[in-house]
Structure formats: C-alpha cells, structure tokens
Amino acid sequence: MSKTYHFIGIKGSGMSALALMLHQMGHKVQGSDVEKYYFTQRGLEQAGITILPFSEDNITPDMELIVGNAFRENNKEVAYALRHQIPFKRYHDFLGDFMKSFISFAVAGAHGKTSTTGLLSHVLKNITDTSYLIGDGTGRGSANAQYFVFESDEYERHFMPYHPEYSIITNIDFDHPDYFTGIADVRNAFNDYAKQVKKALFVYGEDDELKKIEAPAPIYYYGFEEGNDFIAYDITRTTNGSDFKVKHQGEVIGQFHVPAYGKHNILNATAVIANLFVAGIDTALVADHLKTFSGVKRRFTEKIINDTIIIDDFAHHPTEIVATIDAARQKYPSKEIVAIFQPHTFTRTIALLEDFACALNEADSVYLAQIYGSAREVDKGEVKVEDLAAKIIKPSQVVTVENVSPLLDHDNAVYVFMGAGDIQLYEHSFEELLANLTKNNQ
C-alpha cells in the first residue's frame, strides 16, 4: 500500500538515496532542508520530489516522518513533531526495519563504503531485480526486488539497528574523533555490528584491527596475500583499469577487469566477488558486469576543461587521500599530480594533522583550502590550515575561492580536488578560470 513520507533533511546523502528508493517503489515522497545547494538534490529534482524549506506546515499527522541524523530538537519540524506527539523515525532506525523485507547486502568500513556499495549494486542489479541505497545520494527501489544493497555507516554507531544477511567490512581506521575515543573504540563498534550479520561476513584480511573481529556468522577474509579465503593475484594495473584473477580454496574462480584505478578498487572488487560467490550468484555474470561499472558520484569523478584534467573526490581522511593519489598516478603516469585539499572538521584536522601531511606528500604539489567546520563543532582557534601547510614537505600553499590562479603554474598536470566540505566551490572557480582563458585565447 502506498504511503506518504516526509524527510526532514532530505538533502543528506543517505536521506536523498532513501527518498529516491521509496519514490520509485510507488510511495509519495517529499522533504525539507536548508536552502544551500547540495549535489544530492539534482537527483531528487529530476525525480520530481518536492524539496521545501523547513516549516511546521509541512507536517500532517497522516505522514510517516523520517528524520536525518544531523537534525535535533532545535529543528522547527522535529520540535513540532515532538510537541504534537507525531511519531518519527531516525534514518538508521527506519532502514533497520525496512531491510527486513529483503535479502540484504551491507557494506561497512572506515573507507571505501560508497565505492564498494556502488560496485555491488551495479553488478547485482544487472543480474537480478535489486533495490539499493548508496552514500553518494543514489537510490533505486523496486517493489518486486528480492535483494537490497546498502551502505552501513559506523558514525555514532548508526549501523547498530542493521541485521543484514551479508556484510562486507572494507577496513577499520580511526576517524570521527568527535565521537570515537580511539582505534579500540572504533573496533569495538564494528565488532558489535559484525555480531548482528546473519549469514556471512567478508573482511579485508590484511587489516590488523579487522582480524580481531569475532562474530557468530562465518568470516571470509579477502586480500592480496596467501592465507586469505579469497585472493586477488596476477594483477595488471594500466591506464584502462585493473585486471586480476581471484582464487578460493586453491581454485581459480575467475578472471576480472574493473575500469577503476588504485589498489583499493581491486580490493573492493574482490570483496564484491567473494560476497556474490558465497551468495550463489554466477561468477561469470559477475565478471561481465564488473567491466561496465562507471563509478559513483564524487569518487574519482573526472572532467576535462580546456584540455585540463580535473578529478573530484570525496577523500577527507589520510588513507583516502593516499588511495586517490595512487589511482591518479595509475591512470596518468606521465603527468604531475596536483592535489587541492580541504580539511574537513577541526577535530579531524587536529587528530590527524601529521597523517594528513604525510598523505599529501604523495602528490607532486599541494594547495590547501580553508578548513571546513562541521555544523556539530565550533572553531576554537586550535588549528589553522597554515599549520598543515607547514608540515607538508612538497611545494604547498593556501588558496582562496576568490583566487585559485596559482593552480595555473603547472604544465602537464592532473588536478585532484579532495574534501567533504565545499571544495567544489574551489573547483568551480578553477573551472571558470580555465574557461575564461579559453575565451581570451580565441
């Protein structure tokens, strides 16, 4: 039966994906959010989903309310619902109930969740009817789907309402220092989550923290080294992507190609191959559809302006920065790699300052944008982006949105914009600068 859903904070990456999914399943969907433009709203607008400013008038008692995790009691719509005793569910609680109707495939991990969820969704939807929810704001819903693929987020232990049949865990790393106290706290959260997986876990076997995970369901380890249950080997990385074989229990189960770059994407693909193999999906079909994966939003997204290659990536943790630069070097081995990075949150910048500097030294030149503070924190003046610049060995400087012209001082370069804040404003400024150069040269 069709329902009416109202999303409070509909532009969030998970919320927008869920809204799209429910819309495609035939439900009436609307939502509210701040006026600022987010890349997620394009898909909502294309689907004809109404996006409203926050107002008490948006809510009627017959609606099912889904509230984004960033919105608390000081939001006027949340306050109205509480005052009038109109029930609502948080995003993760709704998802925990929703998945009970499907055979569910989850992807968890500190890094690589969105790319791996996108890859698993792409392969499975091309083999059989599948609903999915990806952290880049993409969602697909089918009333007849047997399978549901989704991204499982560890922040504030939001994945605890989830009890999937299968789950990949890509890695464990210290992140979200505003919530987690250290790596042991992160590992404990993942261990609690792992105990809820019903049929099987697929865990990166070369991660020391992940090796400590214990769960009632069988754990299959994947990676490059002997001793893993699923081993990627005979690897060839070219400017067209990555080719490799996978063996399980000493037997070759297939030869694969992914049009993606970086070692991390070979691992992501191996996790997907392992999961679908154990779930009984034809490996030959999996290999066919891996070849056609075009990526997910804001993960190594490329464009060319005035013969200049620009890469946009969500990387906002040192591990992700290293992986993104590695991918850029694989695809463009003869070009200078210029990194433009915006630190995301003051707490993360303070906690990982040395690691950020070390990661950015993998680039040939570095430009830094001002730190993007989270809505959850206040700038106490404890760290400035210049503190990071001082620790970087490679040539580096701070740029502003108004003046990105120093980026023009490079020939034969690939420009890699990385961050989870508003780094795209800097990217757009650079694109306008390049476009104006073209006009002036005509």
Swiss-Prot record:
Q: Which GO terms describe its molecular function?
A: ATP binding; UDP-N-acetylmuramate-L-alanine ligase activity
Which parts of the sequence bind ATP? Answer: 109-115
Instruction: Report the principal subcellular site.
Output: cytoplasm
Q: Please write the reaction equations for the catalytic activity of this protein.
A: UDP-N-acetyl-alpha-D-muramate + L-alanine + ATP = UDP-N-acetyl-alpha-D-muramoyl-L-alanine + ADP + phosphate + H(+)
- Cell compartments where the protein resides: Cytoplasm
Q: Which GO terms describe its biological process?
A: cell division; cell wall organization; peptidoglycan biosynthetic process; regulation of cell shape
Q: What Gene3D superfamilies is this protein classified in?
A: Mur ligase, C-terminal domain, Mur-like, catalytic domain, NAD(P)-binding Rossmann-like Domain
Identify the metabolic or biological route this protein is part of. Cell wall biogenesis; peptidoglycan biosynthesis
Q: Which GO terms describe its cellular component?
A: cytoplasm
> Which top-level enzyme class is recorded in the Swiss-Prot or TrEMBL entry?
ligase
Q: Tell me its EC number(s), please.
A: 6.3.2.8
Quote the InterPro entries the UniProt record gives.
Answer: Mur-like_cat_sf, Mur_ligase_C, Mur_ligase_C_dom_sf, Mur_ligase_cen, Mur_ligase_N, MurCDEF_pg_biosynth, UDP-N-AcMur_Ala_ligase_MurC
Recite the UniProt keywords alphabetically. Answer: ATP-binding, Cell cycle, Cell division, Cell shape, Cell wall biogenesis/degradation, Cytoplasm, Ligase, Nucleotide-binding, Peptidoglycan synthesis
- Role description: Cell wall formation.
**Which PANTHER family is this protein grouped with?**
UDP-N-ACETYLMURAMATE--L-ALANINE LIGASE, UDP-N-ACETYLMURAMATE--L-ALANINE LIGASE-RELATED
Family designation: Belongs to the MurCDEF family.
Q: What is this protein called?
A: UDP-N-acetylmuramate--L-alanine ligase
Q: Which gene encodes it?
A: murC
